[in-house]
Amino acid sequence: MKEALLTYLNERIDWHKREQTRLRGEYRQDEAAHVQIAINVYNIFLSTYQAMKFDLGETLRRFSSIVSNWDESHRVACEHGDDTKKFVEEIKFARAMEIIQRA
């Protein structure tokens, strides 16, 4: 199961990177930015899975904790415009990586 999940995660990351390149080529920067968020989420999950020594149960608990903190940040960002949204996304990503590194 470990290898299948790792393969799946890496395939999803690769697909999203190709999609992002395509969108940028079509000058659809907003959509490409949303794809970057998806790439970040897959990378965070993958990093968490590796940090938890491939324990899927613990990975899901940690990842759920990380994601639950994003909802409030997203609501605040939506109320304050695009610059704030971008900043909040960067903060969420940095915070998630900090949590993973402490694991």
Show the residue positions of the predicted features:
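Short linear sequence elements within intrinsically disordered, low-complexity coil regions
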Residues: 13, 32, 47-50, 54, ...
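Alpha-helical segments in soluble extracytoplasmic regions
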Residues: 30-38, 45
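Amphipathic alpha-helical binding modules
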Residues: 70-103
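Short amphipathic alpha-helical heptad-repeat segments
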Residues: 1-19, 38, 56-72
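Generic N-terminal initiation segments characterized by hydrophobic and/or small/turn-forming residues
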Residues: 2-6, 20, 43, 77, ...
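Amphipathic alpha-helical coiled-coil segments
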Residues: 41-57, 95-103
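Charged, low-complexity interaction regions
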Residues: 21-33, 54, 75-88
